[in-house]
Amino acid sequence: MITPASALRRFPPYRLAGKAYGQSNSITGPLILGGILKKAGHEVEAYEELNGSVPYKHLKDADVVCLYTLTCSAPRAYELAEWFHANTHARVLIGGIHASALPEEAARYADQVIVGEGESVILDVVEGRITDKIVNAPCPEDLDRIPFPDYSILKT
């Protein structure tokens, strides 16, 4: 799971001299989805580009790469998707607010796009039971059943 750095955010966190400043809250969704995958027995690592360097060479062996997009980070997410397609065998999944608003755009870069809240479909998508190019996830019926983010998978 990678949350790409964006060129612009409304109240942007930033890096200066190797240290991150400000608050980033865009990683919560990926940490929830990663926690679901981890609980099901998958090896999961999450990275937020803004908080440090992502070891892309290390990720060359990944089977699946999930990219989370805000509108401000979509160009970077698409750049990363192209890199993973060119340099790895990984399937690339794209989700997040921007992908939910413009799924056809995201589908040009991803093997699959998750539209909406992915908690109910992420496991089936990753394990190949859902193969649609654009996956429309249903709205959660009971918010109390959504797990807490698993910060243990965050590597940066």
State each model region's role.
Residues 1-156:
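Acidic, low-complexity intrinsically disordered segments
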